[in-house]
């Protein structure tokens, strides 16, 4: 069984730090081997808009789009996608490259409708989405 590379997409700017706890949870899952065949690619490990800044927006855009193309699937936190242009671009890029998009979120009133429409399936929680990825995509 090969590793399933999963790109983590979701709002970074204009949301508080607590909102990023879902990314921390993904790292915890990977580091502790809970799902040994899942590998998370988190773009904010490279540029996080606070202390890790790109030299240009093009540099950031090119890297993130390239990372998406190297992944098997995109996992998107849809909460606050209505204020995140970058999340929308990541989702659209994955869609155009025929990369499956799996969504999750609990605050539907903060979702950008077009982002949600691009998802193959949407779950309420991160845990359920990860279990689905492991049981479905990682077993191929």
Q: Which residue stretches match the model-derived regions?
A:
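Conserved catalytic or regulatory cores that recognize and/or transform ribose-phosphate-containing ligands
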Residues: 1-140
């Amino acid at each position: 069984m090969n590793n399933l590379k999963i790109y983590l997409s979701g709002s970074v700017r204009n949301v508080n730090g607590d909102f990023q706890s879902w990314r921390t949870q993904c790292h915890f899952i990977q580091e502790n081997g809970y799902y040994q065949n899942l590998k998370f690619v988190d773009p904010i490990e490279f540029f996080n808009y606070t202390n890790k800044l790109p030299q240009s927006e093009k540099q950031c855009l090119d890297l993130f789009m390239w990372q998406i193309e190297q992944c098997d699937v995109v996992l998107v936190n849809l909460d606050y996608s209505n204020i995140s242009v970058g999340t929308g671009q990541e989702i659209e890029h994955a869609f155009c490259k025929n990369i499956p998009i799996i969504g999750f979120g609990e605050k539907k009133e903060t979702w950008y409708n077009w982002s949600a429409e691009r998802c193959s399936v949407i779950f309420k929680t991160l845990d359920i989405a990860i279990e689905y990825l492991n049981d479905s995509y990682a077993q191929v």
